[in-house]
Swiss-Prot record:
GO terms for molecular function: ATP binding; kanamycin kinase activity. The gene is aphA. Resistance to kanamycin and structurally-related aminoglycosides, including amikacin. The active site is at D189. Keywords: Antibiotic resistance, ATP-binding, Kinase, Nucleotide-binding, Transferase. Its EC number is 2.7.1.95. InterPro entries: AGP_Transferase (IPR051678), Aminoglycoside_PTrfase (IPR002575), Kan/Strep_kinase (IPR024165), Kinase-like_dom_sf (IPR011009). This is Aminoglycoside 3'-phosphotransferase. It catalyses: kanamycin A + ATP = kanamycin 3'-phosphate + ADP + H(+).
Length: 263
């Protein structure tokens, strides 16, 4: 606690809680779980990420906008202090989908939940959404991250069929081959570790820094990739699209998976 760059006001809010650092996440944010029963979470990003989708101020703005539209954590406190953005929030309601359902035991249920998420997202009115994650916006952000050595890139973890030798080559391809977009609400980083469930239904979402207006296909490739990697049978990819009532656009799916290699 002593090493945290937080204001006296925030310190007073959290001093009674037991503080445990979360080591699961892959983003540059620092995340702490506070408490054991009525939990709070403190998420912190340094000023180098200001204005990017990693910045917790952006996540705070989206959480406030999503109140009444989607089940999201409550914003308890936000501040910029000593070069850091600090977001204190409530715990999401329910249990993580990744903990509630085993992929090999409940594949149909997981597919149903992914489809439910996509339908929920696409039903939201985005006319006053505070952030746009169009490809122009994401690629401009990516250029900044690459130029400042802030991009989360590990070429060894790229998909086996990724034909690019380095991040800049992939970036150039993504900029040249941008598909047309039809904007809807998008989570931006969807997966079973971002979805909470309760009584068999979606009950919450976390990690909302990349949410906002984006192409309607933006979240779908994350679901397809998770189904293939975690369940492994192509029939469940087909079931996913059957539940959505659409045919897969494989070019867009491949494009957005490639884009995610650099975030």
């Amino acid at each position: 606690m002593a090493k945290m760059r937080i204001s006296p006001e925030l310190k007073k809010l959290i001093e009674k809680y037991r503080c445990v650092k979360d080591t699961e996440g892959m983003s540059p944010a620092k995340v702490y779980k506070l408490g054991e029963n009525e939990n709070l979470y403190l998420k912190m990003t340094d000023s180098r990420y200001k204005g990017t989708t990693y910045d917790v101020e952006r996540e705070k703005d989206m959480m406030l906008w999503l109140e009444g539209k989607l089940p999201v954590p409550k914003v308890v406190h936000f501040e910029r202090h000593d070069g850091w953005s600090n977001l204190l929030m409530s715990e999401a309601d329910g249990v993580l989908c990744s903990e509630e359902y085993e992929d090999e035991q409940s594949p149909e249920k997981i597919i149903e939940l992914y489809a439910e998420c996509i339908r929920l997202f696409h039903s939201i009115d985005i006319s006053d959404c505070p952030y746009t994650n169009s490809l122009d916006s994401r690629l401009a952000e990516l250029d900044y991250l690459l130029n400042n050595d802030l991009a989360d890139v590990d070429c060894e973890n790229w998909e086996e069929d990724t034909p690019f030798k380095d991040p800049r080559e992939l970036y150039d391809f993504l900029k040249t081959e941008k598909p047309e977009e039809e904007l809807v609400f998008s989570h931006g980083d969807l997966g079973d570790s971002k979805i909470f469930v309760k009584d068999g239904k979606v009950s919450g979402f976390i990690d909302l820094g990349r949410s906002g207006r984006a192409d309607k296909w933006y979240d779908i490739p994350f679901c397809v990739r998770s189904i293939r990697e975690d369940i492994g049978e192509e029939q469940y990819v087909e079931l996913f699209f059957d539940l959505l009532g659409i045919k897969p656009d494989w070019e867009k799916i491949k494009y957005y998976i490639l884009l995610d290699e650099l975030f």
